[in-house]
């Protein structure tokens, strides 16, 4: 999948603010600070399209990006960061759940985890929730450049076991671009499939 054009469409919190739903969508979800924005920017070959930050919990809206006029990338707020005010956390849960549960044009969820960390209780809960709603999910382990190749493989197997995944999660590095083409290929395949 070749990225030709990318444009920011809008931010929203409620379904009434979402784009029309005429294009297939791929959503990106994960804990705060797992490298979600860096993954999106690397996939799209844009430096600051999705805002990266050293402050976890920066993304507090659902952000929609039009890719090639043929699909939307949807950047969902990161979850699980302690220093985010409790009132904000209470809004995030329903906002993310409503989008993931109800969005008809959602073709795939890219579930992002830091390769150096074990899945949290929140990760396990979200995975169970996505399974329950039958959402096609691609698991991606970021920050692989922080580990040796052997350690990356070991962590890949460990996360697969922890989440009881039928296939190995993909390994990705924003720094080296490792995994970029494979992730884009999975997105391309999902884009063409209607939700079953």
From Swiss-Prot:
The cross-references to SUPFAM superfamilies, in alphabetical order and at most eight, read: P-loop containing nucleoside triphosphate hydrolases (SSF52540)
- Which CDD domains does this one have? YihA_EngB (cd01876)
- InterPro entries, alphabetically? G_ENGB_dom, GTP-bd, GTP-bd_ribosome_bio_YsxC, P-loop_NTPase
The record's function comment reads:
Necessary for normal cell division and for the maintenance of normal septation.
**This protein's name:** Probable GTP-binding protein EngB
State the Gene Ontology BP annotations.
division septum assembly
Q: Where is the EngB-type G domain?
A: 22-193
- GO cellular component terms attached to this protein's record: cytosol
- What does the similarity note say? Belongs to the TRAFAC class TrmE-Era-EngA-EngB-Septin-like GTPase superfamily. EngB GTPase family.
Enumerate the Pfam families for this protein. MMR_HSR1
Q: Which GO terms describe its molecular function?
A: GTP binding; metal ion binding
Q: Which UniProt keywords apply?
A: Cell cycle, Cell division, GTP-binding, Magnesium, Metal-binding, Nucleotide-binding, Septation
Q: Which residues bind GTP?
A: 30-37, 57-61, 75-78, 142-145, 172-174
């Amino acid at each position: 999948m070749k990225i030709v054009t990318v444009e920011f469409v809008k931010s929203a919190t409620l379904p009434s603010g979402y784009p029309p739903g005429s294009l297939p969508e791929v959503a990106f979800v994960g804990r705060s600070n797992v490298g979600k924005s860096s993954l999106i920017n690397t996939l799209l070959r844009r430096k600051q399209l999705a805002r990266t930050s050293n402050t976890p919990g920066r993304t507090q809206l659902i952000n929609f990006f039009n890719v090639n006029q043929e699909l939307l990338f949807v950047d969902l707020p990161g979850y699980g960061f302690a220093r985010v005010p409790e009132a904000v956390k209470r809004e995030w849960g329903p906002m993310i759940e409503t989008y993931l549960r109800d969005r008809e044009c959602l073709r795939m969820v890219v579930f992002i985890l830091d390769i150096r960390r074990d899945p949290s209780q929140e990760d396990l809960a979200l995975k169970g929730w996505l399974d329950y709603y039958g959402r096609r999910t691609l698991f991606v382990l970021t920050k692989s450049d922080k580990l040796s190749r052997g350690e990356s493989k070991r962590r890949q197997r460990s996360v697969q076991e922890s989440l009881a995944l039928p296939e190995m999660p993909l390994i990705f590095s924003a720094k080296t671009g490792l995994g970029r083409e494979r992730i884009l290929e999975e997105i391309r395949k999902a884009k063409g499939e209607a939700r079953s």
